[in-house]
C-alpha cells in the first residue's frame, strides 16, 4: 500500500491520522493483503493534504496516477521487498502488454477486481462522433471526488506508457450523490481506436 509507505516517511504522520489508524504506521503492510475501505479513504485523504500542487507541479490526484503508472508498469519500487515487487509488477506488466484498444480497456475493467472485492467496472457504450467510450463503476460508492477523478487519470497515464492516447472526464460521481460513477474517455483518432469505438454499442450524443 504505497499510501501507507508515504505516510510512514512523514514525521507528523500521527498528527495527520486518528489514533485508531496508527497501527498502519507500526505494522508491516502486505501488498497482497485486504484492508478496510473506510480506513483507506482516511489514509489517502491525509496524504493528499500533505501534497502542495505548487511544489509537485500538478494536481495531487494526477501526481498519484503518474507515479503509479511509472512504478507499476515499470515494476520499479525500491520500497518493496522482492516478493512484493514481483506481485505488484505481475499485475501491471500483464496490463502493459495490452497495446490494442480492446485489450487495454478489457484489462482496465478487470483491474478493478484486483484491488476491490465489491463493485464492477463496465463499458456501457461509445459515441462514434467524438471517438469516445463510456465506462461505469456499479455497486461501489467512492466518497471522494478526487479519487473518482483518479480512476480516469490512471487510464490516461497507463495509456501514455503503452502508446494509447486518451483524455478522461468524470460525468457521474457517487461523491456527488449520483447512483454510480461514470467516465468518458475520448481517444485520439487512429484506425485502431476508431474501429474499436465503432464495435461498441452506440449511445446517444
In which residue ranges do the predicted regions lie?
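Short alpha-helical "patches" and their helix-cap loops
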Residues: 12-26, 58-67, 86, 167-175
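Amphipathic interaction/junction segments at domain boundaries or subunit interfaces
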Residues: 32-150, 172
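Extended serine/threonine-enriched, polar tracts that run as long, contiguous segments within proteins
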Residues: 160-161
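Short, mixed-charge aromatic SLiMs
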Residues: 23-32, 69-73, 175-186
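Terminal low-complexity, intrinsically disordered regions
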Residues: 1-35, 205
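Short terminal or interdomain "cap/linker" segment that borders an active site or interface and mediates
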Residues: 1-4, 113-152, 164-205
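Active-site-proximal helix/loop capping residues that flank conserved catalytic or ligand/cofactor
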Residues: 13-15, 106, 153, 181
